[in-house]
Amino acid sequence: MGKKYVIGIDYGTESGRAVLVDLEGNEIADHVTPYPHGVIDEVLPESNVQLEPDWALQHPGDYIEVLATAVPAVLQKSGVNPADVIGVGIDFTACTMLPIAGSGEPLCLKPEFKHRPHSWVKLWKHHAAQDEANLLNEMAAKRGEAFLPRYGGKISSEWMIAKIWQILNEDPDIYDQTDLFLEATDWVIFKMTGQLVRNSCTAGYKSIWHKQDGYPSKEFFRALDPRLEHVTETKLRGSIVPLGTRAGVLTKEMAAMMGLLPGTAVAVGNVDAHAAVPGVGVVEPGKMVMAMGTSICHMLLGTEEKYVEGMCGVVEDGIIPGYFGYEAGQSAVGDIFAWYVEQSVPAYVKEAAEKEGVSVHEWLEKRAAAYRPGETGLLALDWWNGNRSVLVDTDLTGLIIGYTLLTKPEEIYRALLEATAFGTRKIIDAFVESGINVDELYACGGLPQKNKLLMQIYADVTNREIKIAASKQTPAVGAAMFAAVAAGKENGGYESIIEAARNMGKVREETFKPIPENVAIYEQLYQEYTKLHDYFGRGENDVMKRLKHWKETARAVKESISLS
């Protein structure tokens, strides 16, 4: 048997990337395909339909474009014979969901529905279902539902049930016309194989499904809304299969589009962050993996099911078979830094960066690195896109305290970096307080590759050594590992994801170790962060929510005046 390869495809927020990997984990070729429609958060494509605040949609055709463009590109770059590619795996943002017709076609691609916002793909960071999430949490708490503690006491507006309920409330006809609500990762697998299966990872973390208990009861859904009573057996029906399972094989049509052979094994869909865990070789407890990009997803393995405040979920076999997989997260990290650079940095900084031939981020990082912890005099709350963990509240907003007339852009930039590190520390503390050890940190994604200052701050704030993924595209490599498992040992792949991870997972030799004097200062700053966190986030002062309410009211008045 000659040398064999697998392909992993990582569907991110703005683009999809394919990586061709050998069975030792060496990356042979990769290609990034930006989504032609990007994130749709203002106006629907091909119409002038304006979207409300907190909406975030996508075009499902963009996902197929990635298959048609990125996969042939890596084959061409590498010169690898398609016959030597034994499997394909994908990972996706989640919960990114869409309504499909009985034919499997997304409703938004039908001419009669394309002007209806609720027919489109709802991206993970669509936060307009917060009202539904609030009511769902109130009802679950009132009824003492057993599932609630598994999700840190709150179900997020980002997840499947809240999004489905929003559709039912705001456009019941779309709900009625929908045959199935699917995670985008499962829909792409369906397009590739013709097989409709749901993966246990998104079902468990995003759709309140439990390996032993299944979905919440019909009685619970009836108490929420009588129209939802049968939602799990109708709109969410379908086989739920574990990670590492073969979903099917490439159809002739999709194989031709992708430049591969019909019959190539396709792994069950996965979540981007979760695929990264084996991607860095982590297959045992005590090692937290941080997938760091526009947001952060924190993942940890355990040997038993425990309840942790504000975690996104604990799912048996949800990350690595044989372990309970814990997930927590921060709703915005890289997005905060990007917002600052794009919206708030003065012109002279951009001009100086251009003159030096560096990006604005690099210019700010270099200058921010000259400051000692505490030297900026600033402290921030990292809630520009709400708080996912531990407060689970998308109505919270960002805050910076300590401004003076002498405050410089690089000081603000550093304060934002530090704020996200404090947010991660808050998550680590929640796990440790619940009896789940966090001994080592692993980081992957775009941020650890680009920003050394950020990683040193995280090491200092958490007082833990951080190991960095060797790959710049760890989720795609992880997806490729699952492809190797789907292909099976008999075809040159692996028997289990643990075996694949031990042979294919890689980290850099360079690590970030905490600096004791920095740790001591950050400990004091973290105590102040905690006071602000609890004051604004736990109900003592709901000013952020009131401001958001007044903003929405003012906008509504303004729109009604413009329409009259």
Curated annotation (Swiss-Prot):
Name the pathway it acts in. Answer: Carbohydrate degradation; L-arabinose degradation via L-ribulose; D-xylulose 5-phosphate from L-arabinose (bacterial route): step 2/3
- One GO CC term, this protein: cytoplasm
Enzymatic reactions:
D-ribulose + ATP = D-ribulose 5-phosphate + ADP + H(+); L-ribulose + ATP = L-ribulose 5-phosphate + ADP + H(+)
Q: Name one Pfam family in it.
A: FGGY_C
Keywords, comma-separated and alphabetical: Arabinose catabolism, ATP-binding, Carbohydrate metabolism, Kinase, Nucleotide-binding, Transferase
What EC class is this?
A: transferase
Molecular function terms, GO-annotated: ATP binding; D-ribulokinase activity; ribulokinase activity
SUPFAM superfamilies referenced in this protein's UniProt entry, alphabetically: Actin-like ATPase domain
State the family named in the UniProt similarity comment for this chain.
Belongs to the ribulokinase family.
Name used for this protein in its record: Ribulokinase
Its source organism is Anoxybacillus flavithermus (strain DSM 21510 / WK1)
